[in-house]
Regions:
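A C-terminal junction/extension of Radical SAM enzymes
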Residues: 162-181
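Conserved AdoMet/S-adenosylmethionine-binding subsite of the radical SAM
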Residues: 2-17, 26-161
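Active-site beta-strand/loop signature of hydrolases that rely on acidic residues for catalysis
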Residues: 23
């Protein structure tokens, strides 16, 4: 921890913000104090989360410890468990986080990394209906980092990604592609 805060102190006035990402940051013991210390240094904080801890999410937002939240929507509710490798996954915490963020308590975005083996056309409409009215939604092109639990995963072409975005825009007009050239 000292290393992190030393780094941030040296860069005050140079950097504007810090992105706290994971794994899942909200699972960490002491995350609130960590965020408080970053805030004391004057940084804005973006939190990347999968939405599994809605109560902690609400707490850090209401305490003013985060300025922006980016939440992963792994897939449609029907295929969420398959996508994360846990069949019959209980989505109730994810659902609570979605509802909370949609209340506009903090600027936020939802995002989905689109993987050909997990996402079909019907999933995009289902996700869109689920997060309808959201501030921002990003469909991100999957990139194989070579360090995946499951090998052989592929991305869609630019054309298919654009078609998916069009489906979603009916429900979430501010839908944008990321990582697609």
């Amino acid at each position: 921890m000292e290393e992190i805060f030393s780094f941030l102190k040296k860069r005050q006035g140079i950097l504007d913000g810090v992105c706290v990402t994971g794994g899942e940051p909200l699972i960490q013991q002491g995350i609130e104090e960590f965020l408080r210390e970053i805030k004391k240094l004057g940084y804005m904080i973006k939190l990347d989360t999968n939405g599994s801890f809605p109560d902690k999410l609400q707490k850090v937002v209401e305490e003013g410890l985060v300025d922006y939240v980016a939440m992963d929507i792994k897939n449609s509710p029907e295929h969420y468990g398959k996508t994360i490798g846990i069949e019959n996954y209980d989505l109730s915490n994810i659902m609570k986080s979605v509802v909370y963020l949609k209340s506009n308590a903090v600027p936020y975005e939802f995002r989905t990394t689109v993987v050909r083996e997990f996402h079909q056309k019907s999933d995009f409409e289902s996700i869109a209906k689920w997060i309808a009215g959201s501030e921002k939604y990003y469909l991100q092109k999957f990139e194989d980092s070579g360090d995946l639990i499951q090998s052989g995963l592929r991305s869609y072409t630019k054309d298919i990604m654009e078609q998916a975005a069009e489906i979603v825009r009916e429900y979430v007009p501010n839908t944008t592609l990321r990582g697609v050239e």
